[in-house]
Every structure is written in C-alpha cells, then in structure tokens.
UniProtKB/Swiss-Prot annotation:
Protein name (record): tRNA pseudouridine synthase B
Any GO BP: mRNA pseudouridine synthesis
Keyword Cell inner membrane: no
Active site, renumbered: D47
PANTHER family: PSEUDOURIDYLATE SYNTHASE TRUB1, TRNA-PSEUDOURIDINE SYNTHASE
InterPro entries (UniProt xref): PsdUridine_synth_cat_dom_sf, PsdUridine_synth_N, PUA-like_sf, PUA_sf, tRNA_psdUridine_synth_TruB, tRNA_sdUridine_synth_fam1_C, TruB_C
Function, in words: Responsible for synthesis of pseudouridine from uracil-55 in the psi GC loop of transfer RNAs.
Gene coding for it: truB
Length: 314
C-alpha cells in the first residue's frame, strides 16, 4: 500500500523576506504549511535578529539548494560602537563598554582592511556544529570550543553612515561570512568595541530584491483567496520562481530527447560542443525544459549529478 503524501508536489523557489525575531527554520515551516508543500528547505540560515532575503526551495527545487548556499550574499548592517556583547549583536548581553573616540578617517581606513580574502573565525553563537551540536548550544552554557578559521572574501564593503556611535554599512561577501564577526572585529580595531543592532540580507546570488514577499503578504493572499472561494494555490504558486534559477550561473547544455532520456536513466552521454569540465545546467528540447545538473566526467561525457523527478500534474 502506497504511503500517503503529506503535502502536494509543488516545485519552485519563494523569496521570503524573513521578519526579525524569528528563526529561519520557523519561517521555513510557516511557508511550507502555507503552500502545503511536500518538501521544503531554506538556503542558508539568517540570525533571528536579521531580516531579509531567505530563498526557500519547495519540492524538487530542494535538490539544488546547495548552489544557493554556496552563492554570494549582500547585507546592510547597522553597528553600535562602544559596546561589545557576548553574541556580537543586540540579542546578547553587554560584556564590555568603552568610550568611542573614532574619526571618520580612522573608521574608513579600518573598514577598508576587511576588503578581499581573509581568514575568519566563526562566532561561538553560530549554527556551525562541533561534535554534532551547534556552537550556540555550547555558548549558551558558557563553554568555548575550538573553531577552525575559514577563508572568506569581502568583495565590497561600503560605509553609508557614521553618526555618533552608529555605523551603517553595506557588504557584498562570499558564502560563510559572518557579518557579526566583521562588526566585532571592526570594534576591536577601533579600540571601542561594537555589536550589530540591525542586519538585513538584501541579496542572494542574482535574485531580485523586489521579488521578496513577507509572511504577512502570503497570509493575506491566502485569507483573501479563502474568502473569495479560490484555492490558495492559485494565488501562491505564481509567486514561485523556477527551480533552475538556483543554478542559472552554470553553463547550459541543451539535450535532444534521446540523450535527455539516457541522462534521466542515469547514463553518461557525449555531447559535441559541451564544456570540457565542471558542472552543467541540463535542459531538454526546444522548450529548454530544465532536467537537472550534470558534470563532465573523465571520459569527456556528461554524467547526471542531480536530476529532477517529473510527476504528473495534480
């Protein structure tokens, strides 16, 4: 007897504007319930304090969420100088207070030092795991554990405002960059300490900022649909972006039907003119239907790596 599905097989990416005070997983579960989705996953957690872009993958799109985890991010951050907290943000307790004697010239010079590649040691208050447990679980018990530094790249860091003890910046960075750690390090460089008071993610990969929707907007759409006798999916599904937007930076290889069928059955295929290495976005036919991601193997063939499972429309 077939197991009954819990949810419907809906595929795509919704760009949620996560509210402050909510964990990324809580936001994910709310979206999953609204869409009555069979599967859902987010593409990189935001701190509860933070707001902004949280791409949520539904259905088959979850297979490609790793590509968004690995993508560049953009943030706007406000930092308060003169106070250091145990979490490096305003959710934590103040552990040190120092006078602020910072000039604009000194601030700009210190900010400039973060540009480029560097080694960053993650905060103890992060979701990274040590011996199977998130670091923040140790931190909340006052336990500090060893953390390995990680290579990060800050492509752009721009000072937008410096008023009194407040600093507002915009950061374009690689995956795995902790903005709280940048702010904490900046405070130490300035000799006064600092912590994050506002953090907003404004960009993930190339997703457009204007396509974000809030939970309030989604709930309102559902309420209006129910009131008007319309199925919620009719108003929610048009907000989804295609699942292949998660891999749009990969080179495309368009396959004829016979080769696509071979790939969908797990076989590697030879394609003239295909790139000689790396991962590829695979499409099929004149309509360029996305079928998954392949990778060039040692034999110069395209081997399937992650494939879309197509289901009958329900």
């Amino acid at each position: 007897m077939a197991r009954r599905r819990k949810g419907r097989p809906i595929d795509g990416v919704i760009l949620l504007d996560k509210p402050t005070g909510m964990s990324s997983n809580d936001a994910l579960q709310k979206v999953k319930r609204l869409y009555f989705a069979e599967k859902a996953g987010h593409t990189g957690a935001l701190d509860p304090l933070a707001t902004g872009m949280l791409p949520i993958c539904l259905g088959e799109a979850t297979k490609f969420s790793q590509f968004l985890l690995d993508s560049d991010k953009r943030y706007r951050v406000i930092a308060k100088l003169g106070e250091r907290t145990d979490t490096s943000d305003s959710d934590g307790d103040v552990v040190e207070t120092r006078p602020v004697n910072v000039t604009l010239e000194t601030l700009e010079a210190c900010i400039e030092k973060f540009r480029g590649e560097s080694d960053q040691v993650p905060s103890m208050f992060s979701a990274l795991k040590y011996q199977g447990k998130p670091l923040y679980e140790y931190a909340r018990k006052g336990i500090e554990v060893p953390r390995e530094s990680r290579k990060i790249t800050v492509y752009e860091i721009t000072l937008h405002r410096f008023e009194g003890e407040e600093v507002e910046m915009e950061v374009h960075c690689s995956k795995g960059t902790y903005i709280r750690t940048i702010v904490d390090d900046l405070g130490e460089m300035l000799g006064c300490g600092a912590h994050v008071t506002m953090l907003r993610r404004t960009g993930v990969a190339k997703y457009p900022y204007e396509n974000m929707v809030t939970l309030e907007q989604l709930n309102e759409l559902v309420d209006n649909a129910n009131r008007d006798g319309v199925a919620p999916r009719e108003v929610l599904d048009p907000l989804l972006m295609p699942m292949d937007t998660a891999v749009e930076d990969l080179p495309e290889v368009n396959l004829i039907a016979d080769l696509a069928d071979m790939v969908m059955h797990g076989q590697a295929v030879q394609v003239l003119g295909a790139p000689t290495e790396g991962q590829l976005r695979l499409t099929m036919g004149e309509e360029r239907r996305f079928i998954g991601v392949g990778e060039m193997n040692r034999d110069g063939k395209i081997a399937p790596k992650r494939l879309v499972v197509f289901r009958d429309e329900e």
